[in-house]
Amino acid sequence: MGWYAIFVMTGKEELVKEEIDRIMSCSETKITYQLIIAKREINERKNGNIRSVIKKLFPGYILLETDNITELYHLIKNCEYLIDILRRGEYFSEIKLEEIANIVYMADDDGVIGNSDIYVENDRIIVTKGPLKNYDGFIKKIDKRKQRITVLFFFNNKEHFIDLSINIIEKFDDKKIGKTIPFFAYRYYQLK
């Protein structure tokens, strides 16, 4: 099974996904596939209030995992609003596993990357809960006012800095808890 990116008209991702599902359910050819419209939950500040909204991670793209890309392409190529499956020359461009792994791991069943709980101690970011808990990558910056963190994703052999939402928790005070927290309980990241 390999991962591919379907290029569609921006804003029509859900329609194309539904159309592909309909075509595949009617098809006699049994092809294993999975479609993900990667999204992120992001905090937006408006008039001093912070509210959470869902935005697409890669507008105009649907992520596709399949075991037979050529056959699937011939079934779906006439979908309205579908532009193409990303290619290199005449061959479909498979997304490297290391590029797609973070996105698939962080996203929930609906393809949404939610909020992470963090606290900042000196020059370290400590992730206590959420999709960033086991993120193994580069963190560019934290915006405490907007409650966002900027992380690096590689997608289609390009670097993408993506803003994700965070909940900033007050700094731990071991004296209040009455016990020490083992070092290995949290993942540490260096601020750059």
Please report, for each region that a protein language model flagged, where it lies by residue.
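Acidic-enriched and Gly/Ser
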Residues: 1-124, 138, 144-146, 150-192
